[in-house]
Structures are given as structure tokens and as C-alpha cells.
A protein has these predicted regions:
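C-terminal beta-signal and adjacent terminal beta-strands/loops
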Residues: 20-22, 614-682
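Short, acidic, small-residue-rich periplasmic hinge/interaction motif at the N-terminus
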Residues: 21-63, 83-85, 92, 140
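N-terminal periplasmic accessory domains that precede
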Residues: 27-28, 38, 71-74, 111-113, ...
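Extracytoplasmic beta-strand/coil segments of soluble accessory domains associated
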Residues: 72-107
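Short acidic/polar hinge/loop motifs at secondary-structure boundaries
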Residues: 104-131
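Transmembrane beta-barrel wall of Gram-negative outer-membrane proteins
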Residues: 169-197, 213-261, 279-283, 289, ...
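Face-selective signature of the C-terminal outer-membrane beta-barrel domain
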Residues: 185, 230-258, 271-427, 482-488, ...
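Outer-membrane beta-barrel signature, preferentially recognizing the C-terminal barrel domain
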Residues: 438-487, 492-494, 512-523, 532, ...
Length: 682
């Protein structure tokens, strides 16, 4: 799932996000302000190496003096990486995360949940690829997280983690991991349990005028509580037949149960109750050989029933809606890589994915009852080549032909990629990347179903005519002394689809729907510099400037062509008090931004974390933290474009928390006789 987004720490939740819980059919406006990476380097130690199109970062070194508890938080420390709407972006664009070089059919949300269960002690390093060659089996930007593999050692080690968070209500996280290795086998097990409550408050203001001149003006304030129980499980087994000859199996499961209530008061009253469940199971089998051939298969099962009950005085009506989505998805691949000598490489392969989506909805007012079954097939063939010209210049290019078939779309598309890397001298890297891609809507967003929020005034509707987007990305990255990173980028997305509100001119209702833009264009520059003062104060300064143009010539009766310059500045400071205590401060401020007809006001935040590591080997860690200390990072939406009037102000308390991490176990002597061998939602 690839979305063109701008830099953002701004819009994490919108009105309809509450109405649908964790559903993607809720109003989740794409975030606007890019929250930039935390890059911290001690002294002049290199943190990045170049291999072909990949920049390999010493991620354990980057997170050494940061209050990072899991792989997801660790990835956010990479240059150019940010988090928006609980998703990762790289240089203002969405990014695919892989584990040990293996693509997956899991959705981004499911993969992020898995990353949050992986302890940082398992991380070896991370590869950043701005234009992934086709041999990676994914398109666009890629972060490849590489884990530690210790086959050849007898080892038993693990980690226990407990976390407490308070944001007006309490939430808890418990996590356990275990890794066992011997001569041939590697077995890792992860389990995480999250539970608790979340509270937030928002204010709404609406002014609505119909074509007959009738006007309405009303405002509400809302109290919202969510309760969640989330289980995440992973079992991974690697069997090494010989050097670089491996058979691996992985099972991942996520079970989520959410209940919530939302009470509106003001010019009208309403009560919304939601109960959403989901279960996800993923099975994967991979086989790799020492002569460059690899194959694999994967099956994913996803089932998500939910219920919504809404009673409102606005229309004196009760809405009782039951929805369900089941997805079965299969994926298989074959690929081959050759070393042709004289620094030439050749690769080619085939991928096939098929899925079956069965969705249904029952509505007491019969407005959107229905059952749908949609089959989707996707097959791609690719060929790629790489060449090194001496020690300073490398180039890699690939071409993928993809066939995509649904009941609506039946298309062939070509996707070229190109990456050129030049090393003028030690510690200096210049890299140019070109990437073409196509982004497809989620299953649920194209269903002709309806749900409600804001006392029934807001309707979240599907769009069966939604088209895939066509994306082009160019970037030029310069790394100085293996520490200072700058990136100039251009992103163009034709038929980009985003969800926007619209106040009808025919009746008193507001509609939220994914619509296709003509285009979304971005030109931006990111600069990141670590600055150390002695051995006790480490800093990182980041600045990003972006010009964005959003155009939609067919958005109801409100066509728009809007442009905006905006920027963000961020400072991250780490103060070292001896060898065992460190204090982290993270401050950010951004200017006004836009998204379609939405205006996003300026805001900022200050976070602090105090970490105590009493043992030399960091086996024990205690962390206390407070995010958004001054409560200035609240999310607000303003839509006053050409007669529309929607003001949403969402308020959150500062987040306070404690976490405890304990690592146990270690390595035993290596066996010298053996060779040391080593990756949906609605």
C-alpha cells in the first residue's frame, strides 16, 4: 500500500476515525507534516555503508542513546524516516518495510504490529533503498530490517518487557521473546499483549447552507473512550542445510478486540457504541540456495466483524449496523540471481498473488445492505541488471511487467527503476533514484457500504469507481562524512486517492469518501545534521521544506487547485549523565499546511524521556517518559473552502509512561566443525 504523503506529525485522528474504530473506511486523513528521523552518531564513527542501490545503516549504533524499545521505534531513527497516522514514511513518501529481505502479503498495519513486538536486541542493521529493484519483489521505497542470526552457536536468549502508559486513561503492554540457536536450527518466538483504555475529547463546528438558501449552524463536543485487547504472536524457524542453503517457516497471528463509546453534547446529543474484532493469520515458507535460486509461498487469512450502534437527537433516529470482511490471500514467487563476472549481475523472476474478498453489511434502515465477493489476481515478471564501474560508481536497473485483474480493472503496466550511486571519496555518497509505481485502493474503500458519525450528520461511504494511482518519484541524496544527510525529492501521483469531507448542497449531511485527485505534486528538501558537544551532549537538527500542489477538477461542485509552502524544524538532544543515565529531549514545530480542501494549522510538541541502564551490558533498562509536555500538539482540521464550514478540534492529554526491559541469556562456544550460516484491513 503506497500513499504519497507529506511530512507529518499533525493529523493522526479525524472525526470518522472514531466512528469506525480501527477500520480503514473511517475518516483517516493523510497526515500533512513530516516528523523527521532521529539520527544520532557518536564521534566520527561511520553509520552508513553502500552496496549497490542499498544504503546499509548501523542501526544499533543509531539507537544506542535513544529510548527505543522495539524495531518499529528503531526504524524511525533512520535518516528521512517519519511516522504519520501510525504509519512510516521515507522522504515524504510511503515506504515498504521488509524483514530479512522477504516481502509479505501482510498489510502495513499488520506488519507494524509485528515490528512493535521485535526487541531491539535482535536488530543487526537496516538497508534503505529509495528505488527498490524488482528483485526485492516490491515497488517503491524499501526499508529492509536485518535481524541477528547466530546459527553455528549454541545460544538461548530472550527479553521481557513491560510498559505502562497514562493519557487520561491507563494502557499496558507486556512482551516476551525467546531465541534458540544451535548448529543447524534457529527458532524465535515472540508474544505481545496490549490492553487498556484511551480517552480523547474533540469539538466540532458546522455551518451548512443548501442551494435553496436554507442554513444550519450547530456545534458539539464529544467525549470518547476506547478499550482494547490485542494479542500478537510470531513463530519463526530456520533450518540451515549448508552454507547459504536454508529452509525457513514463519507464522504470525494478531487478535484484536476493541470496544468504544462516543457521547456528543451541544446543539444535539448522540451516543455511539462500537465493537470491532479482527483476527489475522499468516503462514510463510521460503527456500534459498547457494547458487542464487530462491522460492516461496505465503497464505494470509483475515476476518474482521464489527457492530455499530448510534442513537442521535439530530434526526431522532437509531442506526444499527453490522459489517464483516473476510480475505483469503495467496502469494508465490520464484527468482534467480547470477554473478556474471566483471562486476556484472543479472536477476529475474516471477510473482503471483491471488485474493478473495467477501464483505457484507446489514443496516437497520436498509440504506447500504449488501454482500460482495471480489476476486483479484496479480502477476508480474521482471528482469534486472547491476554493474560496478570500479570502486566509485555502481548502477542497478530493472523492468517489471505486471498484470492486474479485478471485476473492474484489467491492466498491463510497466514499472522501470534506476539507481545510480557515486562515491567521490571516502565517507561521501551521491545517489540518484528513479521509481515508477501504481497504488491500488483498499478492498473496503471500493465497497458501496455506509457507516455514520457525528450523530448521523457524517456519512462514511465507499466509492466503487475509485481508480488506482500512478506514481513517479525522483530523489537525489547526498551523504557527507557518512553522517550528514540531505535529500532533494520530487513526487508526482496522478489519480491519487484520499478521503475528504463534503457538505451536501441538497440536504443536511456531510459525506466522507475516497476520491481521485487529478494529481498531488511535491518538491522538497530535507537536511539532517548530528552535532556533538563533548561526550555528554549529542544533538541532531533537522529541517524540511516542501512545496505541495493538490488538484482535483471534479470534486463535486468544488473543484480545487491549491498550493502551499510549508516546513518543519526538529531538534533531538541527548544528555549523558555518566554511563548509566541519559535524558532525551525531542522538540518539533511545523507551519500551516494543506490537504485538498483541508487546512492544517501550525503546531508543535516537546517530548522528554529519562533512561537508566545500571548494567554494563544493558541487560536491564528502566525508562520514564512524557510526550507532548505542554499539550501543544493537538490535531485540528479547518475546511472553509468555497462555502464549506467544518471545524474539528481534537484534544489529547500529555502522555506519561514507564517501561522496564530485561534481557537474559547469551552465547555459548561456537562449534568449530560447523560453518557459520545465517525475513488488510478495511
Amino acid at each position: 500500500m503506497k500513499r504519497l504523503v507529506i511530512l507529518s506529525a499533525c493529523l493522526a485522528i479525524s472525526l470518522a476515525d472514531w466512528a469506525q474504530g480501527n477500520r480503514n473506511d473511517s475518516l483517516r486523513m493523510d497526515s500533512i507534516i513530516h516528523s523527521l528521523p532521529d539520527v544520532m552518531v557518536k564521534g566520527n564513527r561511520p553509520i552508513v555503508k553502500v552496496k549497490g542501490a542499498a544504503l546499509t545503516y548501523d542501526l544499533p549504533q543509531l539507537i544506542k542513546n535513544h529510548p527505543v524499545d522495539n524495531a518499529y521505534e528503531a526504524i524511525k531513527q533512520l535518516p528521512g524516516v517519519s511516522e504519520q497516522d501510525e504509519a512510516l514514511t521515507l522522504n515524504a513518501q510511503s515506504v515498504t518495510v521488509m524483514i530479512d529481505g522477504k516481502a509479505t502479503t501482510m498489510t502495513s498495519e499488520q506488519l507494524y504490529s509485528l515490528l512493535k513486538t521485535i526487541p531491539t536486541s535482535r536488530i543487526a542493521n537496516a538497508e534503505v533503498i529509495y528505488s527498490a529493484p524488482a528483485r526485492y519483489q516490491v515497488k517503491g521505497q524499501v526499508i529492509n530490517l536485518l535481524l541477528k542470526h547466530n546459527t553455528g552457536f549454541h545460544s538461548l536468549q530472550g527479553e521481557l518487557f513491560g510498559g505502562y502508559t497514562h493519557q487520561n486513561r491507563n494502557s499496558y503492554t507486556e512482551r516476551a521473546s525467546l531465541l534458540f540457536t544451535n548448529k543447524k536450527w534457529e527458532i524465535d518466538m515472540l508474544y505481545s499483549f496490549g490492553h487498556g483504555k484511551r480517552y480523547y475529547y474533540y469539538e466540532n463546528e458546522f455551518a451548512h447552507t443548501l442551494t435553496d438558501g436554507t442554513s444550519y449552524a450547530f456545534s458539539t463536543h464529544s467525549d470518547n473512550i476506547k478499550r482494547h485487547l490485542n494479542h500478537s504472536i510470531r513463530l519463526g524457524i530456520n533450518y540451515h542445510l549448508a552454507k547459504n542453503h536454508q529452509l525457513s517457516f514463519a507464522y504470525t497471528s494478531q487478535l484484536n478486540n476493541t470496544r468504544g463509546t462516543s457521547e456528543d453534547d451541544g446543539d444535539f446529543t448522540s451516543l455511539l457504541r462500537i465493537h470491532a474484532k479482527s483476527q489475522f493469520h499468516n503462514f510463510r515458507l521460503d527456500y534459498s540456495t547457494p547458487f542464487g535460486f530462491s522460492a516461496g509461498a505465503e497464505y494470509t487469512y483475515y476476518n474482521s466483524p464489527d457492530e455499530q450502534w448510534l442513537k442521535s437527537s439530530l434526526y431522532d433516529e437509531i442506526y444499527d449496523i453490522t459489517s464483516q470482511q473476510r480475505i483469503d490471500k495467496w502469494h508465490a514467487y520464484l527468482k534467480q540471481e547470477h554473478d556474471l563476472g566483471k562486476d556484472w549481475g543479472l536477476n529475474y523472476g516471477i510473482n503471483y498473488t491471488t485474493s478473495r474478498d467477501k464483505s457484507s453489511q446489514e443496516n437497520n434502515n436498509k440504506s447500504s445492505d449488501g454482500n460482495t465477493i471480489q476476486n483479484e489476481d496479480q502477476m508480474s515478471f521482471y528482469v534486472g541488471a547491476s554493474k560496478s564501474f570500479g570502486q566509485k560508481l555502481t548502477m542497478e536497473a530493472s523492468l517489471m511487467e505486471e498484470y492486474y485483474h479485478t471485476p473492474i480493472w484489467n491492466e498491463w503496466n510497466l514499472f522501470p527503476t534506476l539507481s545510480i550511486t557515486y562515491l567521490p571519496k571516502a565517507g561521501h555518497v551521491i545517489q540518484f533514484d528513479l521509481d515508477c509505481d501504481r497504488d491500488y485502493p483498499t478492498y473496503w474503500s471500493v465497497k458501496n457500504f455506509t457507516t455514520y458519525n457525528v450523530g448521523g450528520y457524517g456519512k462514511i461511504v465507499g466509492n466503487p469507481t475509485l481508480k488506482p494511482s500512478r506514481d513517479l518519484s525522483l530523489s537525489l541524496t547526498y551523504i557527507l562524512h557518512s553522517r550528514y544527510v540531505s535529500s532533494l525529492f520530487f513526487n508526482n501521483s496522478k489519480d491519487e486517492f484520499r478521503q475528504l469531507p463534503y457538505q451536501s448542497d441538497k440536504k443536511k449531511e456531510m459525506e466522507y469518501k475516497h476520491v481521485n485527485f487529478d494529481h498531488v505534486n511535491q518538491v522538497g528538501l530535507m537536511l539532517t545534521a548530528p552535532i556533538n558537544i563533548g561526550n555528554w551532549w549529542q544533538n541532531r537538527l533537522t529541517f524540511t521544506g516542501v512545496y505541495q500542489n493538490d488538484k482535483n477538477s471534479h470534486f463535486y461542485d468544488l473543484p480545487f487547485d491549491r498550493s502551499k509552502w510549508f516546513c518543519q524544524a526538529q531538534w533531538n538532544g541527548t544528555f549523558l549523565f555518566g554511563k548509566h543515565v541519559l535524558l532525551n529531549l525531542d522538540a518539533s514545530v511545523h507551519t500551516d499546511a494543506i490537504q485538498g480542501i483541508i487546512d492544517i494549522p501550525a503546531s508543535g510538541y516537546l517530548n522528554a524521556a529519562l533512561t537508566w541502564k545500571p548494567l554494563k551490558d544493558d541487560k536491564f533498562q528502566l525508562k520514564a517518559y512524557c510526550n507532548d509536555i505542554f499539550e501543544t500538539g493537538d490535531n485540528h482540521l479547518h475546511d472553509t473552502y468555497r462555502g464549506q464550514h467544518v471545524i474539528n478540534k481534537m484534544y489529547f492529554d500529555r502522555i506519561k509512561g514507564l517501561s522496564l526491559t530485561y534481557r537474559y541469556g547469551g552465547y555459548k562456544a561456537k562449534q568449530h566443525e560447523e560453518v557459520d550460516t545465517s525475513r488488510f484491513g478495511k
